[in-house]
């Protein structure tokens, strides 16, 4: 376990990480750190890493940024918490989430997995070359869900239905293990066609999105 970690960055991730480390008895404000952990925007990682004195481990928490951004440090790794963070909540946001650990040596891998476990995360190994594809998958699962919720809300608003009624439905879909239901799963193409007609009449800007998602759902259902 790393006992002295200097956390750089106090955004949503950095504040949660620092709070959890303090909970676990890790010194985050002292001198002579064993690890310098960069919790800064992706665009700032390379510049901040270059300013860190050599010696300790240097790591970042980005999902998309390769380890090369941590040059010139050879003792390096990354731990990406696969979670979405908000300032309204604290370190409990880390509990039980998975974490992608990317490392180039066994020692770095051990350090990364140790950090993840200290934070309350469930580590798995991820190749540096796979980071972009991995991050795209995470964006689908997190950011694009927000986009879909907004699209569904617009249709509810046009129908005179309360958008907040969608939230229990979305939660139950997750709780049910993403089991596919609905008209495409049933092969009810008349209903799908009726959806398209209604969307084209009231929210035409969402028709292409519906068509694309319907095609992807059909592939999933067959």
Q: Over which residues does each language-model region extend?
A:
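NAD(P)+-binding Rossmann beta1-loop-alpha1 motif at the extreme N-terminus of oxidoreductases
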Residues: 1-32
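Phosphate-coordination loops involved in phosphoryl transfer and adenosine-cofactor binding
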Residues: 2-4, 55, 96
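Hydrophobic Val/Ile/Leu positions in short beta-strands of Rossmann-like dinucleotide-binding domains
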Residues: 5-7, 38, 101
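Rossmann-like NAD(P)(H) cofactor-binding subdomain of soluble oxidoreductases
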Residues: 15, 19, 32-91
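Short phosphate-binding/catalytic loops that engage adenosine nucleotides
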Residues: 25-26, 74, 121, 161
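Internal alpha-helical scaffold of NAD(P)-dependent oxidoreductase catalytic cores
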Residues: 91-175
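NAD(P)-dependent Rossmann-like dehydrogenase/reductase catalytic/cofactor-binding core
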Residues: 163-222
